[in-house]
Amino acid sequence: MAWRRGFGREEEDAAAAGESGLELCLGLPAYFSSSSSSKPSEGSTAAPAFALRSNGTNASKPSGAAAAAPVVGWPPVRSFRRNLASSSSSSSKQAPPPPSSSPQNGDKASKDGGAEKGMFVKINMDGVPIGRKVDLAAYGGYAQLSAAVDKLFRGLLAAQSAAADGEADAAAAGEMVGGGEYTLVYEDDEGDRMLVGDVPWQMFIATAKRLRVLKSSDLPPPSLMRAAGSRKRAAADS
């Protein structure tokens, strides 16, 4: 009987233990188990520690990489080199484009340059070793040019013929070019020798390259006649 009672208690204790395991609760299953609750707590504490260690190692690595990286802008460039580079770049950006040369402008410039060059011409006189230069644009006609030539060479002729008083007095009394003693000729752009006064004044200025004062006695008679006619036309034009 005693054995049956003991056996019956064991069955009751086992049934009570099974019923207590089947009880419902609102907590986590690990809360009711000491062994299971201790393990997750250890894992949970170990996990943050591992995370902190990993974060610490990872945080230390970028600082080392940044220290090992080369510094930008090293070696330093001197200030005057920087200023020189900046000024050259700004001047290249602000430089105006070169002017376009058109053929019409070039032809016009060449013509103007030729006209300006033709304004000053050399003039020589027979018996005078030194030449002069005259500005044809400064005179308004053939009469003014003849008077200017007389003024240029009268003193030189007087100095050369100082020994002959009669010739010097004649040269001082009369007009050399206009009086018939000397004749004014010129060389045109083709190299031909022409008498002054045969063409209009503007054409003469454009084509005359060199002037020469020749003695009328050295010229042939037809030339003298043409010279006299040209002087008359020049006097009429003036």
Swiss-Prot record:
A GO CC annotation given for this chain: nucleus
Biased composition (Basic residues): 229-238
Motif (EAR-like (transcriptional repression)): 24-28
This protein's UniProt keywords: Auxin signaling pathway, Nucleus, Repressor, Transcription, Transcription regulation
Induction: By auxin.
Entries under PROSITE patterns matching the protein: PB1
Annotated region described as Disordered, given as residue ranges: 33-69, 82-114, 217-238
Compartments, as annotated in UniProt: Nucleus
Keyword hit for Cell wall biogenesis/degradation: no
PB1 domain mapped to chain residues: 118-216
Listed GO biological process terms: auxin-activated signaling pathway; regulation of DNA-templated transcription; response to auxin
UniProt xrefs under SUPFAM superfamilies: CAD & PB1 domains
Tissues expressing the protein: Highly expressed in flowers.
Assembly description: Homodimers and heterodimers.
Function comment: Aux/IAA proteins are short-lived transcriptional factors that function as repressors of early auxin response genes at low auxin concentrations.
Similarity annotation: Belongs to the Aux/IAA family.
Protein name: Auxin-responsive protein IAA2
Organism: Oryza sativa subsp. japonica
